[in-house]
């Protein structure tokens, strides 16, 4: 089985970005793999190995669109255990969800994966669109916001669960398909391939970290750089971001000494009661 995992580099979400003159100042920003895409890589690795730390059966290919230094994030994913990496070189600030999906559709056509798994959304834009657009353009089934994946022994379908407002929804999806994953996908028993791992198989309750052995092995793995033009993708973006603005400053909270004082402030100042 071949699994393709599209991944995006994002600014470190723990750092405060500077917003000025309608744009975000990314000078000096540190970049990392979008956390939800890391979860997708972990899910793909579990689906292609014989239990925790077991032999890999199949191939996990990661792909990212961005400038040349995005190779640093791809090398991290190779060190995690991915077999190959593809960098579609280009300006990742000049993309929208539709163009990303068109580029990925061309990559899918070239790679012919059995399954595409990606994060439910990127933490910088929070658009939650690429997986759905890609599935629609390919005419493939899609399963989004997944909390678990159980791949059938014949590799032709998967039973998946997703958390919804009313509880947990279970579906069966035929392959090839597009899947987007949520945080719970890295649970101990959230992902399993019936053909490779027994029902008792468990993994760590988190995504794996790159080991020294993995880092050394990554140096010998293929990281291929291609261009958007070589994929035959034409046309520009459909959605343009006009400006970014920082949230307006809020007044500091106040402490009250009693319930009576709180009620008085809610009535006289906030005027909500």
What positions do the PLM features span?
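N-terminal glycine-rich FAD/FM-binding segment characteristic of electron-transfer flavoproteins
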Residues: 1-273
């Amino acid at each position: 089985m071949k699994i393709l995992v599209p991944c995006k580099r994002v600014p470190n979400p723990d750092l405060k970005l500077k917003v000025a003159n309608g744009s975000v100042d990314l000078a000096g920003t540190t970049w990392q793999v979008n956390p939800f895409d890391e979860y997708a890589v972990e899910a793909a690795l579990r689906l292609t190995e014989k239990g925790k730390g077991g032999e890999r059966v199949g191939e996990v290919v990661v792909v990212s669109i961005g400038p040349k230094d995005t190779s640093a994030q791809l090398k991290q994913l190779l060190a995690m255990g991915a077999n190959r990496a593809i960098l579609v070189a280009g300006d990742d600030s000049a993309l929208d969800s539709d163009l990303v999906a068109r580029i990925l559709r061309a990559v899918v056509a070239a790679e012919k994966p059995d399954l595409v798994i990606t994060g439910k959304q990127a933490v910088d834009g929070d658009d939650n669109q690429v997986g759905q657009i890609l599935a629609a353009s390919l005419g493939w089934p899609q399963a989004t916001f997944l909390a678990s994946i159980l791949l059938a022994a014949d590799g032709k379908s998967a039973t998946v669960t997703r958390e919804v407002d009313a509880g947990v929804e279970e579906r069966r999806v035929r392959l090839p398909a597009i899947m987007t994953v949520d945080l719970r996908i890295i649970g101990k028993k959230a992902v399993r391939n019936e053909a490779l791992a027994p029902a008792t198989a468990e993994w760590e309750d988190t995504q794996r970290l790159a080991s020294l052995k993995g880092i050394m092995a990554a140096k010998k793995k293929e990281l291929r750089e291609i261009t958007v033009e070589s994929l035959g993708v034409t046309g520009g973006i459909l959605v343009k971001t006009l400006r970014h603005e920082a949230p307006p400053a809020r007044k500091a909270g106040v402490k009250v000494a009693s319930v009576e004082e709180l009620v008085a402030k809610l009535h006289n100042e906030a005027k909500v009661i």
